[in-house]
From Swiss-Prot:
It catalyses: alpha-D-glucosaminyl-[heparan sulfate](n) + 3'-phosphoadenylyl sulfate = 6-sulfo-alpha-D-glucosaminyl-[heparan sulfate](n) + adenosine 3',5'-bisphosphate + H(+). It is a single-pass type II membrane protein. Glycans are attached at residues 261, 317, 328. This is Heparan-sulfate 6-O-sulfotransferase 1. It comes from Gallus gallus (Chicken). N-glycosylated.
Length: 408
């Protein structure tokens, strides 16, 4: 009887070794085959009452760019009680306001952000001390300037927090940059409508290499206080319009091209350097989401930082840009004006989809392995002789324990 039990344990051990080897093989295989493999669904996640909350991975997705597995995993050991800080780079008209509110109002935290009525900023302290873990518009305000870009934030954030939260002999902070991107045509039209209603970002600093640009380096598209009432044609005709390729400019290291000095290097070379810099910085960010994929954005953020949202994200397709009727010629013109953004978005969308595919499929594979182990354990328990099962499950009673003590 005992021999039969040992045989069953040996079989179980061999099976688990085979399963472990299979997992390693599948991870190696993914590197070459890509995310087309269908590997299964997540387990133990929130929103169990909504099994279809996150879209099923597309088994027919064809990737455009090659990314090694290390670029797809993106699971960080974010330590809110340590020195880690999330820095949100908010690009205009990408849905950043909604996402920023999610960060301060919708994350399940040990110590929730303190958001009081009538106040524009929330207090987001760490659970163990009065220091912020989030650098964003709705937590620290525009501390590095209105809609500060990558160049500004990376040079400004450490100093700002160092002055606000100085402490002797402290461990250096670790910054995790995040952002949202949007389809360039939709984003451009949304910005035009925003400007048409009288909005401006003229208080933005555009700080680069320790100074702001001169009026000659960054001319204005309009005279007066704002550009309200401008037509789409007027908006497109301004050669200095910062709406053109805004996403690339705000994600690139502008120091590489002489900041806003257009005569620093030839225009074609400048454009290529900016695009490659934006791609690199985006890829190296801790996380980025896409406005067009709210649920996938939520999913990737949660898995990257191991933080859960209280309420699921909603996908709103009826935006102001969506209500603008433009002909095909105008769309092509907008695409030309935003050619760098179009290339960046194509790159970002593919990386985003590959990360989503990878994480979802990995979770499904882990769930399959877990289910197999549970079935194997159940079968092994059923296979044990009845007497042995009863003997293993018998609990010592008080009389039985007294008998043992007396005998001893």
């Amino acid at each position: 009887m005992k021999r039969a039990g040992r045989t069953m344990v040996e079989r179980t051990s061999k099976f688990l070794l085979i399963v472990a080897a299979s997992v390693c093989f599948m991870l190696i295989l993914y590197q070459y085959v890509g995310p087309g493999l269908s590997l299964g669904a997540p387990s133990g996640r929130p929103y169990a009452e909504e099994p279809d909350l996150f879209p099923t991975p597309d088994p027919h997705y064809v990737k455009k760019y090659y990314f090694p597995v290390r670029e797809l995993e993106r699971e960080l050991a974010f330590d809110m009680k340590g020195e880690d800080v999330i820095v949100f780079l908010h690009i205009q008209k990408t849905g950043g306001t909604t996402f920023g509110r999610h960060l301060v109002q919708n994350v399940r935290l040990e110590v929730p952000c303190d958001c009081r009525p009538g106040q524009k900023k929330c207090t987001c302290y760490r659970p163990n001390r009065r220091e912020t873990w989030l650098f964003s518009r709705f937590s620290t305000g525009w501390s590095c300037g209105l809609h500060a870009d990558w160049t500004e934030l990376t040079n400004c954030v450490p100093g700002v927090l160092g002055r606000r939260e100085s402490a002797p002999n402290r461990t250096p902070r670790k910054f995790y940059y995040i952002t949202l991107l949007r389809d360039p045509v939709s984003r451009y039209l949304s910005e035009w409508r925003h400007v048409q209603r009288g909005a401006t970002w003229k208080t933005s600093l555009h700080m680069c290499d320790g100074r702001t640009p001169t009026p000659e380096e960054l001319p204005s598209c309009y005279e007066g206080t704002d550009w309200s009432g401008c037509t789409l044609q007027e908006f497109m005709d301004c050669p200095y319009n910062l709406a053109n390729n805004r996403q690339v400019r705000m994600l690139a290291d502008l120091s590489l091209v002489g900041c806003y000095n257009m005569s620093f290097i030839p225009e074609n070379k400048r454009a290529q350097i900016l695009l490659e810099s934006a791609k690199k910085n985006l890829k190296d960010m801790a996380f980025f989401g896409l406005t067009e994929f709210q649920r996938k954005t939520q999913y990737l953020f949660e898995r990257t930082f191991n933080l859960k949202f209280i309420r699921p994200f909603m996908q709103y397709n009826s935006t102001r840009a969506g209500g603008v009727e433009v002909d095909n010629d105008t769309i092509r013109r907008i695409e030309e004006l935003n050619d760098l953004d179009m290339q960046l978005y194509d790159y970002a969308k593919d990386l985003f989809q590959q990360r989503y595919q990878y994480k979802r499929q990995l979770e499904r594979m882990e769930q399959r392995i877990k289910n197999r182990e549970e079935r194997l354990l159940h079968r092994s328990n059923e296979a044990l002789p009845k007497e042995e099962t009863e003997e293993q499950g018998r609990l010592p009673t008080e009389d039985y324990m007294s008998h043992i003590i007396e005998k001893w």
